[in-house]
Regions:
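Short, hydrophobic/glycine-enriched beta-strand segments
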Residues: 1-3, 424
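Nucleotide-state-sensitive switch-loop elements of NTP-binding domains
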Residues: 3, 7-109, 114-122, 126-139
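Hydrophobic side chains in well-ordered alpha-helices
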Residues: 8-9, 94, 168, 342, ...
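C-terminal accessory "lid"/substrate-recognition subdomains
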Residues: 29-31, 110, 116-119, 125-248, ...
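Alpha-helical scaffold elements adjacent to nucleotide-binding pockets in ATP/GTP-utilizing enzyme cores
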Residues: 68, 93-97, 152, 168-171, ...
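Short glycine-rich or small-residue beta-strand-to-loop segments that form or flank ligand, phosphate
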Residues: 81-87, 156-157, 329, 422
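Generic C-terminus detector
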Residues: 401-403, 407-469
């Protein structure tokens, strides 16, 4: 949500002396340029343009971002640089660009208005249809882009909203239960020239099933850099997809206490998370000002590799079973493969059964391939995520990351290894019983299962078109 993102950035600029926000506006990409602005708490400090790279606005952003952060670092006048990402920019991609540029990230924060959650998850429009495509070849949808922005960040800056209800807060908690949630006040933010801004904010119609109530979110990055040669380096925070400290080559890179893969007892780990609101996330007392809590979160630390592992379908930290305020999460785990034709026939019903579903699944005619399930906004993405570890020779295991081996060990079965179904469905008004019956009907029958893997591979390859074979 643009307003939520701007409120989070404004709060950081107000609470951290000598801080600036770096923002690349991609709305001018059609004219061949990307507009870059740098502002502080008083307004715009400088503005410029970056040319498109290969007709791709995000490519231009990647080319321009690190040099600008380094320029701010070298000037030695900026304590915090907030990288405010544009609406459809993926925080994961930009966080990895900053990390590989020799800069250290201190956090990734997504700013959220809970009242806009469902409208975004229900919006299956292509980004191009709403003017948010980052390139001519951009085929992403509003819903799946938003879901990734939300789920990647270990910290959610939750803007206060009179329209948000218990259902909205429960949905937020169940979609990303491990996130640290920090409350922020809704500010009267402008674009630096006195104009209020609100890009792509859908109205909130009456709720029917899980479809229209709504939400919107934007990630925030912050990176903290150690001072080079005794000079102060700016920390960099990004609103839209994470907090990036881009001032120096030794920025803080630890994982926050609630970040995936983080050890709360490890040196440099962030503070324990403070929960707000009701629902599955529970409530914990808050200490200090709202602003200081957001600043603490912005400097908590961020591990790019751990964050990537937490999103990989083979070892993703998926939500757990939950039922709160009319919102439910079903975790469906089985050790029998799907029949390809029956599953393919059920895809539309399964995709529309929940506001959000994701996980990994096992197809009988592709017994060695781990498949990724990613659905939002009534659209489903299915893709190969590589082999199941059970299909690899022992010698290849040494090349598998430890986190992947650990995830496989949790699912290990004496006969099938890590091959399994692990799908998670989250939605208001979730029909658990009907969903489970539909999923069960797609599994191999006892007779089909007993025929063995050689027979499974001869089943009709219904998913070839989806997997581009």
């Amino acid at each position: 949500h643009a307003d939520a993102r701007q409120a989070a950035v404004a709060r950081l600029l107000a609470d951290v002396p000598d801080s600036v926000a770096l923002h690349h506006d991609l709305t001018t990409a059609a004219a061949g340029t990307v507009v870059r602005t740098i502002r502080d708490a008083t307004g715009i400090v400088s503005a410029g343009e970056a040319p498109l790279v290969n007709d791709c606005a995000c490519c231009a952003l990647r080319e321009d971002l690190v040099p600008e952060l380094r320029r701010l670092a070298d000037a030695g006048l900026t304590r915090l640089a907030v990288v405010e990402l544009w609406d459809s920019v993926e925080p994961k991609a930009m966080a990895e660009v900053v990390a590989t540029g020799g800069l250290r990230l201190t956090s990734v924060i997504t700013a959220v208005d809970p009242a806009l959650l469902l409208p975004y998850l229900a919006d299956g429009d292509d980004l191009a249809e709403v003017g948010l495509a980052a390139a001519a070849t951009d085929r992403r949808t509003v819903a799946d882009t938003f879901a990734r922005q939300l789920e990647y960040a270990p910290v959610l800056a939750v803007v206060s909203s009179e329209q948000a209800d218990d259902e909205d807060r429960a949905l937020l908690a169940q979609l990303h239960p491990t996130a640290r949630r920090v409350p922020i006040d809704a500010l009267d933010v402008t674009d630096g020239e006195g104009r209020g801004t609100d890009w792509f904010a859908p109205a909130r119609p009456p709720a029917t099933g899980w479809t229209p109530p709504g939400w919107e979110a934007d990630p925030v990055h912050t990176t903290n850099a150690a001072p080079p040669h005794g000079c102060g380096s700016p920390d960099v925070a990004t609103s839209g997809a994470g907090a990036i400290d881009g001032a120096g080559t030794t920025a803080d890179a630890g994982a926050g206490a609630d970040a995936p893969g983080a050890d709360p007892a490890a040196p440099g780990a962030g503070p324990r998370s403070e929960r707000i609101g009701s629902g599955a996330g529970g409530t914990e007392p808050r200490s200090g000002r709202t602003g200081s809590a957001l600043v603490d979160a912005a400097f908590a630390g961020f591990d790019v590799e751990a964050a990537a592992a937490a999103q990989h379908p083979a070892c993703a930290l998926l939500p757990a079973e939950a039922d709160e305020a009319g919102v439910g999460t079903l975790v469906w785990h089985r050790r029998r493969p799907f029949h390809p034709e029956r599953l393919y026939a059920a895809l539309e019903d399964l995709t529309c059964a929940a506001a959000r579903s994701r996980g990994r699944f096992w197809l009988a005619d592709r017994p060695d391939t781990l498949l990724h399930w990613d659905a939002a906004g009534g659209a489903l993405c299915v893709e190969s995520a590589g082999p199941w570890l059970a299909s690899l020779p022992d010698a290849a295991w040494d090349m598998v990351p430890p986190v992947r081996r650990a995830a496989a060990a949790l699912d290990w079965h004496p006969e099938h290894g890590d091959c399994c179904q692990h799908l998670v469905f989250t939605s208001p008004g979730l029909d658990r019983e009907g969903l489970e019956l539909l999923l069960e009907s797609c599994l191999l029958t006892d007779a089909e299962y007993a025929a063995g893997p050689a027979a499974w591979k001869r089943l009709p390859p219904a998913f070839d078109s989806l997997l581009e074979v």
